[in-house]
């Protein structure tokens, strides 16, 4: 299940369904209600017996982009806010399609091709601009794409898992590709870390730092420990050659880190922690600023080590300006409880909320910022082991669950009144999409103008 921002406070979500792993796309309003008559639209009717990961992104005009595999081909499909297909293109032949939107509005896709990664750029009308695409490779090594995020000036950064032998060490390399297809960093990419190895089959995601660079987090083996790294827009690492460990000790196992960039500009990372050869699990976090750990050498306890069935899926999130950690607290193999803890700046827990404690299993937690200082959380699960229904919830900055408070219809600038300033915003978006699409039909038009005028503040 993937998420992307939609216009007017909405969110796009995509998911796989059916016996052939069909790809579907849905748009939800701020209260979580489907905005399309059919609820979801079919992106691709597939007849696959297995599938790989895929990507979802959106642009400033509210259009959605889904990149996925169709047998041996990688496809990129674009939909408008009303759920209509804008275009669909074949990106190339390979596996594991991923997508992002650059600062200039172009959509970028990357995928694994043989032992290398290929990258392509598309304009708003679906025209590929880089010929056969840009190849990211290294002689004698495999270079498999893990994620793609925007950089600056229309460029993107692509992270790749690099290794020379199947059982050998697996590290991360980062490549920057400019809008004209040039690669200003090392031809074989810049190493995110050089010491240690990723877990086999782990392809960690990363996030843009807002300044043309990126933050990375991952966990290494022998010992199982989490690390973070920052690379600037020039490709220079900021946290040493191999990053900074989340703690100064390695007596317990730390895996599956998740990170978010706080409103204060600091990096927050959360992970699952386990005492080896035991049933002792915990959820911990660390804050980084100025290349240093801020929550002590051992990090902060979100949920202290204790004897339970398991504690997993530590997932970083934002509720307004605050940072939260969602996680799974499991008392048994057939019962998972999703919790959310809001963290204070000093690493203490401000509040803790039960998100979902109903009977059944819950896994694959994902989180994205919501509207009105809230956050959205989604997961898979169901009443029985192996169930894979999709669920979502919204949590507010005060820890309460549910839809955001009802605002003033037509108050586009959030000043509490509907007046000429809001009318100006609506007219500037006329014919397109955006926050002035008050009825959620994908276009700012006369129907939205009527709603705004009906709410005009006397």
Locate the predicted segments by residue.
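Extracellular, repeat-based ectodomains that mediate carbohydrate processing or recognition
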Residues: 1-405
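Cellulosome-associated attachment modules in secreted, modular CAZymes
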Residues: 400-458
């Amino acid at each position: 299940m993937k998420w992307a921002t939609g216009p007017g406070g909405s969110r796009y979500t995509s998911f796989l369904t059916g016996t052939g792993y069909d790809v579907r796309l849905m748009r939800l309003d701020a209260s979580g209600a489907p905005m399309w008559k059919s609820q979801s639209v079919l992106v691709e009717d597939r007849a696959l017996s297995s599938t790989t990961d895929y990507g979802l992104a959106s642009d400033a005009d509210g259009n959605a982009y889904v990149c996925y595999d169709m047998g041996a081909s990688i496809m990129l499909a674009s939909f408008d806010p009303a759920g209509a297909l804008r275009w669909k293109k074949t990106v190339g032949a390979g596996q594991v399609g991923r997508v992002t939107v650059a600062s200039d509005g172009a959509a970028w896709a990357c995928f694994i091709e043989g032992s290398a990664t290929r990258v392509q750029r598309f304009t708003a009308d679906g025209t590929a601009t880089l010929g056969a695409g840009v190849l990211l490779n290294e002689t004698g090594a495999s270079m498999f794409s893990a994620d793609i995020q925007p950089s600056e000036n229309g460029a993107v950064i692509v992270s790749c898992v690099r290794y020379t032998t199947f059982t050998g060490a697996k590290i991360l390399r980062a490549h920057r590709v400019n809008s004209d297809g040039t690669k200003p960093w090392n031809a074989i990419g810049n190493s995110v870390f050089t010491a240690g190895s990723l877990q086999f089959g782990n392809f960690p995601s990363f996030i843009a730092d807002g300044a043309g660079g990126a933050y990375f987090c991952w966990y290494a083996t022998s010992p199982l420990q989490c690390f973070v790294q920052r690379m600037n827009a020039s490709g220079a690492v900021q946290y040493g050659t191999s990053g900074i460990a989340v703690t100064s000790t390695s007596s317990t196992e730390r895996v599956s880190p998740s990170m978010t960039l706080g409103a204060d500009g600091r990096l927050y990372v959360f992970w699952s922690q386990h005492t080896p050869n035991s049933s002792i699990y915990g959820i911990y976090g660390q804050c980084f600023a100025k290349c240093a750990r801020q929550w002590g050498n051992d990090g902060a306890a979100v949920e202290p080590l204790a004897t339970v069935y398991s504690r997993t899926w530590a997932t970083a999130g934002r509720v307004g300006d605050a940072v939260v950690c969602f996680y799974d607290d499991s008392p048994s193999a057939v019962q998972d409880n999703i919790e959310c803890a809001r963290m204070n700046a000093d690493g203490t827990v401000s509040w803790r909320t039960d998100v979902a404690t109903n009977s059944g299993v819950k896994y694959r937690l994902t989180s994205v910022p919501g509207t009105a200082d809230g956050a959205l959380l989604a997961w898979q699960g169901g009443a029985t082991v192996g169930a894979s229904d999709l669920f979502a919830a919204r949590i507010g900055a005060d820890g309460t669950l549910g839809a955001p408070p009802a605002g003033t219809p037509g108050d586009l600038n959030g000043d509490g009144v509907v007046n000429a300033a809001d009318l100006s915003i609506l007219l500037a978006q006329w014919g397109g999409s955006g926050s002035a699409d008050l009825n959620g039909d994908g276009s700012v038009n006369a129907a939205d103008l009527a709603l705004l005028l009906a709410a005009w503040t006397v």
